[in-house]
């Protein structure tokens, strides 16, 4: 069965309440997951530090009459920024800083991601987001899937939970970008041939996630091997000290690939009708676009006229220098939204 058909079967099972769709043999899956769990114990020692909080305001130098953009991150430890020590090195901070630079507006970041979360935790996370009295976010990023694989969550259930989360956020009025399941074959203590099998399971889930998210009005970016052959070529640099979560450089690599899609979702990125064939862009059936994106890290998939989707390889944008958040209470704005003298200095982000 082709990769596209497998992804479509999983997505269809999720949409219509079907049971689990087998990805590969159950015994093989169990062996893969046992090795991945062993790898996590070897590299993490069973104790993971709490990710630094990056909640706050970015781009305070752009304060003006417009309200700040509201940006929320949901998902698992990757979305939370597990593996780095400084808030400014987390994907939330990197994306918020980049978004502020492109929009030339402050950005308020809220991160509700939970390390260890699976897709069934998205219901709780979305409810937290929609209950926020400050209003519906302008854009949300969801990064989820690795724990679904390692804990053997049925793929149909995983995709159903993600699709529901995207639908709820889109119905409320938020734009949604999903970073799909990363490639578990890049974890160093997982060896061949299990590394190949872990990669296959991860990619099949990523493709099915793409179909589910796009059909609910979201956009996806394939994280794959966390966005590029750099990870396999330089694992010591792009993985963190635990060899399982990304390092600061790894998160920056992933964020550079996601930022253009985040900006495009908000209408801040120039959209061209031209599809660059040399970059393998094109209009494809959703399932085929999803399958291809899962194999090519950093690929964006967005809905076109059903049952088609646009597959794009946006050029990565250099991120601003690492920045730390400004707490909302100290963002240096008065009641009219203008800068307050003597406040917000030293911790605000400014253009380089």
Name these PLM-found stretches.
Residues 34, 38-113:
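Serine-esterase "nucleophile elbow" of acetyl-processing enzymes
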Residues 70, 138-141, 175:
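Structural motif
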């Amino acid at each position: 069965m082709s990769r596209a058909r497998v992804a479509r079967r999983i997505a269809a099972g999720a949409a219509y309440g079907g049971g689990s769709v087998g990805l590969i043999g159950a015994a093989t899956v169990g062996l893969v997951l046992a090795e991945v769990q062993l790898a996590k114990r070897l590299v993490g020692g069973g104790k993971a530090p709490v990710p630094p909080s990056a909640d706050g305001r970015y781009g305070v130098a752009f304060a003006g009459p417009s309200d700040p953009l509201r940006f929320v991150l949901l998902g698992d430890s990757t979305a939370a920024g597990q593996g780095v020590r400084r808030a400014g090195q987390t994907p939330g901070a990197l994306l918020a800083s980049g978004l502020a630079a492109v929009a030339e507006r402050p950005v308020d970041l809220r991160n509700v991601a939970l390390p260890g979360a699976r897709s069934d935790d998205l219901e709780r996370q979305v409810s937290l987001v929609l209950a926020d009295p400050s209003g519906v976010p302008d854009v949300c990023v969801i990064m989820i899937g690795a724990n679904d694989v390692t804990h053997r969550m049925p793929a149909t259930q995983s995709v159903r939970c993600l699709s529901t989360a995207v639908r709820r956020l889109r119905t409320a009025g938020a734009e949604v970008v999903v970073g799909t399941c990363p490639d578990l074959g890049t974890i160093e203590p997982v060896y061949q041939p299990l590394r190949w099998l872990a990669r296959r399971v991860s990619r099949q889930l990523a493709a099915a996630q793409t179909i589910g998210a796009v059909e609910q009005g979201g956009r996806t970016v394939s994280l794959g091997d966390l966005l590029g052959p750099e990870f396999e070529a330089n694992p010591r640099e792009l993985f963190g000290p635990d060899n399982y979560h990304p390092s600061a450089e790894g998160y920056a690599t992933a964020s550079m690939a996601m930022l253009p899609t985040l900006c495009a979702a908000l209408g801040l990125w120039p959209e061209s009708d031209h599809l660059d064939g040399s970059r393998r862009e094109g209009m494809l059936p959703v399932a085929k676009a999803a399958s291809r994106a899962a194999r090519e890290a950093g690929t964006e998939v967005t809905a076109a006229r059903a049952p088609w989707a646009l597959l794009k390889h946006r050029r990565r944008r250099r991120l601003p220098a690492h920045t730390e958040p400004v707490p909302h209470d100290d963002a240096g704005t008065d009641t009219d939204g203008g800068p307050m003298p003597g406040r917000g200095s030293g911790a605000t982000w400014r253009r380089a």
